[in-house]
Amino acid sequence: MGAPRISHSLALLLCCSVLSSVYALVDADDVITKEEQIILLRNAQAQCEQRLKEVLRVPELAESAKDWMSRSAKTKKEKPAEKLYSQAEESREVSDRSRLQDGFCLPEWDNIVCWPAGVPGKVVAVPCPDYIYDFNHKGRAYRRCDSNGSWELVPGNNRTWANYSECVKFLTNETREREVFDRLGMIYTVGYSISLGSLTVAVLILGYFRRLHCTRNYIHMHLFVSFMLRAVSIFIKDAVLYSGVSTDEIERITEEELRAFTEPPPADKAGFVGCRVAVTVFLYFLTTNYYWILVEGLYLHSLIFMAFFSEKKYLWGFTLFGWGLPAVFVAVWVTVRATLANTECWDLSSGNKKWIIQVPILAAIVVNFILFINIIRVLATKLRETNAGRCDTRQQYRKLLKSTLVLMPLFGVHYIVFMATPYTEVSGILWQVQMHYEMLFNSFQGFFVAIIYCFCNGEVQAEIKKSWSRWTLALDFKRKARSGSSTYSYGPMVSHTSVTNVGPRGGLALSLSPRLAPGAGASANGHHQLPGYVKHGSISENSLPSSGPEPGTKDDGYLNGSGLYEPMVGEQPPPLLEEERETVM
């Protein structure tokens, strides 16, 4: 009774998490790029210029610093100003009660912040804008309005003075954000590289050995290739999007460079073609990876719950589903972006248009999770039936846990964990935990899948052992041939005989040849007439001992010995299920 209760409770808990986080996952913007930052700055500039026109047209409008900033940016939690700017609070109070009058510093846009009107002789403080993603949103930017009613200039430079030191703390080496980003980049780069290498070896192994060519391994190969293409597309996208400046250059960004982001875009948009292609390819392979994970779940679920299952018939359907359906979603997204939001590089979220890609991915995750829960339910029920009357419940729970852990990488269950907690700021312990978790599991998932479903597969290990035995025996034969001797095998025994001493053994050869050699043209060497004789260099598969169970033979249990598909007394297990045993062993 314990195992079913555990599985039902787990299903209820995680299903509630999925349902409560549908909108959160789809609406979350995980990454912001340079192009998106430029768009956000230009949008803020347009809003600010609109407000400036209204104020200049109707000077009687009351404009406080707080109300002014709320028009162009979401005000964050205020942080106490430094002692140097103790007059800033008084300036805001005066500004709140004042109207735009003669002698006041005019409101303006400095390509970073929309500044309100300034009181002569006072310091104006505004929150660091949240539309600049990497700013410290708890800090403030400062300007001083001199007694003449004009903004204070930088000495020796015809430029308005402004202090953004609290906003640009992310640009210094004194903060830990730089270390966090470097560590995250290293994690996913190493993870995708290891996954790419291991998956390449796994695909070569499954494709090289003909005895491993079957429907389930074909599906495994498609899944491996989807992980490989996802990793390659991520590397290409990063190279195209983030190759403009290096990390050291980013740390030396100045206010002038931030202001330069709002310059008009170039008239020629051909430079964005490569970026758009890279983003489109990345989104396609990302979607295909999720759908091939779903195909694995559908295939295993079909073997368990369908009495008649034609593997060859469904293989073509699975292939079209895994590679074709994502192409439809991506094609629709490309069409919408090209017609309705053809701006800059297409890595921008562009509002609700991102639902075209994210909703199908979310649907694949939810459906695969439901299949996973259903299979675990059947596994728990089978364990209860096979262990009826036994008192060892620890072993039962151990088998259930082991089988669950094996299935989790295949079904992508780890995607569910942080679906309900999308991050909105690049800060905080929760954000760091979430990012490390996602980067670790997403990048290493391909490696885990290759280990479990290829390198730890019994059939794969048996074929590798056979191939290794053939190669070593052939190499040994060639070495002996060069040294002038031959090696012979008599069943389990091996004899090394010098070529000069080899000759016909009359009595033995004559007595064995009528029974073992059908023709009179038998070799003069008596070794050819002995039972079990195999000469090195000509080893056949039948001469080697069996290295593992064949697909149709009975094993000790399915799903790592859990006994999910152990037949009842007098019951013959379906051949497809017996063949599928090695998938999760």
UniProtKB/Swiss-Prot annotation:
One of its GO terms (biological process) is intracellular calcium ion homeostasis. Residues 27-185, 237-276, 337-355, 423-434 are extracellular. Keywords: Cell membrane, Disulfide bond, G-protein coupled receptor, Glycoprotein, Membrane, Receptor, Signal, Transducer, Transmembrane, Transmembrane helix. The keyword Ribonucleoprotein does not apply. A motif (Important for interaction with G proteins) lies at residues 468-471. The keyword Glycoprotein applies. Glycans are attached at residues 148, 158, 163, 173. Homodimer in the absence of bound ligand. Peptide hormone binding leads to dissociation of the homodimer. G-protein-coupled receptor for parathyroid hormone (PTH) and for parathyroid hormone-related peptide (PTHLH). Ligand binding causes a conformation change that triggers signaling via guanine nucleotide-binding proteins (G proteins) and modulates the activity of downstream effectors, such as adenylate cyclase (cAMP). PTH1R is coupled to G(s) G alpha proteins and mediates activation of adenylate cyclase activity. PTHLH dissociates from PTH1R more rapidly than PTH; as consequence, the cAMP response induced by PTHLH decays faster than the response induced by PTH. This is Parathyroid hormone/parathyroid hormone-related peptide receptor. It comes from Didelphis virginiana. The gene is PTH1R.
